[in-house]
Amino acid sequence: MNLRRKNRLWVVCAVLAGLALTTALVLYALRANIDLFYTPGEILYGKRETQQLPAVGQRLRVGGMVMPGSVRRDPDSLKVNFSLYDAEGSVTVSYEGILPDLFREGQGVVVQGTLEKGNHVLAHEVLAKHDENYTPPEVEKAMQENHRRPQRVDKDTSS
């Protein structure tokens, strides 16, 4: 093998090794930012396919319904505690911040946070779900005003 081919081979090998290293680092970084979705029952009993429970300290998203009577607000701060439930069980959630306008008992929500001991989720974001028939009040008012029937004006045409 002549010197020129040998140098090209080294360059190609170095480029491939660099691409492999870059790909590995990107995948490792993405793995740390993935929030897996769970229901309250899956937190308690594991995913249906694998029966694997989420680890304490794991970042996750939990979707369920806010249990009626479970919302407890701290009067001196923005802290709120509530329970999320589904057909298989419930988990408690702590959140500090402003809740969405659509948040209420019996409403579906998705929380993002970390799993703590005792099936407790420390949330850093709460997203309220709404049904497909929901229309914001401002839009509904505008629609009613735009579709209001014009007032009838009767003109006397007999003159």
Swiss-Prot record:
<comment type="similarity">
    <text>Belongs to the CcmE/CycJ family.</text>
</comment>
<dbReference type="InterPro" id="IPR012340">
    <property type="entry name" value="NA-bd_OB-fold"/>
</dbReference>
<keyword id="KW-0472">Membrane</keyword>
<feature type="binding site" description="covalent">
    <location>
        <position position="130"/>
    </location>
    <ligand>
        <name>heme</name>
    </ligand>
</feature>
<feature type="region of interest" description="Disordered">
    <location>
        <begin position="130"/>
        <end position="159"/>
    </location>
</feature>
<keyword id="KW-0735">Signal-anchor</keyword>
<feature type="topological domain" description="Periplasmic">
    <location>
        <begin position="30"/>
        <end position="159"/>
    </location>
</feature>
<keyword id="KW-0349">Heme</keyword>
<feature type="binding site" description="axial binding residue">
    <location>
        <position position="134"/>
    </location>
    <ligand>
        <name>heme</name>
    </ligand>
</feature>
<dbReference type="GO" id="GO:0017004">
    <property type="term" value="P:cytochrome complex assembly"/>
</dbReference>
<feature type="transmembrane region" description="Helical; Signal-anchor for type II membrane protein">
    <location>
        <begin position="9"/>
        <end position="29"/>
    </location>
</feature>
<keyword id="KW-0997">Cell inner membrane</keyword>
<dbReference type="Pfam" id="PF03100">
    <property type="entry name" value="CcmE"/>
</dbReference>
<dbReference type="InterPro" id="IPR004329">
    <property type="entry name" value="CcmE"/>
</dbReference>
<protein>
    <recommendedName>
        <fullName>Cytochrome c-type biogenesis protein CcmE 1</fullName>
    </recommendedName>
</protein>
<feature type="topological domain" description="Cytoplasmic">
    <location>
        <begin position="1"/>
        <end position="8"/>
    </location>
</feature>
<dbReference type="GO" id="GO:0005886">
    <property type="term" value="C:plasma membrane"/>
</dbReference>
<dbReference type="GO" id="GO:0046872">
    <property type="term" value="F:metal ion binding"/>
</dbReference>
<keyword id="KW-0201">Cytochrome c-type biogenesis</keyword>
<keyword id="KW-0408">Iron</keyword>
<keyword id="KW-1003">Cell membrane</keyword>
<dbReference type="GO" id="GO:0020037">
    <property type="term" value="F:heme binding"/>
</dbReference>
<keyword id="KW-0479">Metal-binding</keyword>
<keyword id="KW-1133">Transmembrane helix</keyword>
<keyword id="KW-0812">Transmembrane</keyword>
<comment type="function">
    <text>Heme chaperone required for the biogenesis of c-type cytochromes. Transiently binds heme delivered by CcmC and transfers the heme to apo-cytochromes in a process facilitated by CcmF and CcmH.</text>
</comment>
<dbReference type="InterPro" id="IPR036127">
    <property type="entry name" value="CcmE-like_sf"/>
</dbReference>
